[in-house]
Amino acid sequence: MKVANGYEYTAIMEKIAPKKLAMEGDPIGLQVGDLSRKVRKIMFTLDVLEEVVDEAIEKKVDLIIAHHPFLYRPTQHIDTTTKQGKMIKKLIKHDITVFAAHTNLDIAQGGVNNILADLLHLQNTTMIEETYSEPYCKIAVYVPENELESVRLALVNNGAGQIGTEYTECTFHTTGIGSFKPGANANPTIGEKDALTSVPEVKIEAIFPQYLTETITKAVKIAHPYEEPAIDVYTLEMQTYKEGLGRVGMLPKKLGMVSFIDKLKTAFAIDNVRFIGDLKTTVHKVAIIGGDGNKFIHQAKSTGADVFITGDVYYHTGHDLLAINLPTIDAGHNIEKVMKGYLKNKMEEQAKILDYEAEFIVSEVNTDPFQFC
């Protein structure tokens, strides 16, 4: 097994939460440290606080992957007598690198908002606000029949073959005869130099978002037995890859608001929420934006949701929500902590595929600043 470096692990993060999905001005990516260093232990956290850094030092962590960037605003100086300055000093002293995936992880398929929606068992989910779009592409690879599975895995393990939110590993195969004549300096896997060779081959096709072109073609070339594999990639004019903030979906059955709030508290492992609206409301359609959703109340209303779930609702936004008759549950910003276990599992899965050797852990520090008395 290989001990990979920080760049190789952030390449996995790019598959999970592509940087291009982030909202404008969001300071994602490297926060502190050296991505060229070898990584043997990775810790996932919602926030980077001094207590989290102390935990990382104690557990000999090499790379912290956080949801919230702690260097969110431009820093003119680092005063090591302050709490944040001490934290940065500790990170540098102990060679701990910090990487953040923020709104890109909120927006990505399978990211924070999908996890929250899944915990509530929402069905037929769609986005609340579209924030990104680009064309879909289709790849066609021609491969000997006995090597089909290795190429198929290279495609689907790198993001090809997803149609909608519920169908993955979607490919189409056709069989035919491939013919080629290797040159004098070629090193053919099949056939002889300067001789025309005909081979039964399979054409495997799959669609993927355009931004994955380089990742997928590189993976296919590695998996393919030929030194010069035949690969076609073309843009699909009729299909567009879209991502956006928040999720809206249907509960399996209607619930009263009080029962739904109880369900939510259990699902998110929280004891209290703030509520705006009529507790007698019946809930079937649910909209959710993890974190601060104050700017998106009208978009949530336009979905026809019976209730909107978010965090950090401002006092005057509460009045606005009453005015537009959108019952709202403020479940707190900390519910986004669900990303820790999700990223741990995804990273372990990808590291196993790539044969990377590392330990993956989640921070045990509760970073929620609020207590209910």
UniProtKB/Swiss-Prot annotation:
Any matching Pfam family: DUF34_NIF3
InterPro entries noted in UniProt: DUF34/NIF3 (IPR002678), DUF34/NIF3_bac (IPR017221), DUF34/NIF3_sf (IPR036069), N-reg_PII/ATP_PRibTrfase_C (IPR015867)
Residue positions binding a divalent metal cation 2: H68, H333, E336
SUPFAM superfamilies: NIF3 (NGG1p interacting factor 3)-like
GO MF assignments: metal ion binding
GO CC field: cytoplasm
Protein keywords: Metal-binding
Sites where the protein binds a divalent metal cation 1: H67, D106, E336
Subunit structure, as described in the record: Homohexamer.
Family affiliation: Belongs to the GTP cyclohydrolase I type 2/NIF3 family.
Protein name: GTP cyclohydrolase 1 type 2 homolog
Source organism of the structure: Listeria monocytogenes serovar 1/2a (strain ATCC BAA-679 / EGD-e)
Lineage of the species this protein comes from: Bacteria, Bacillati, Bacillota, Bacilli, Bacillales
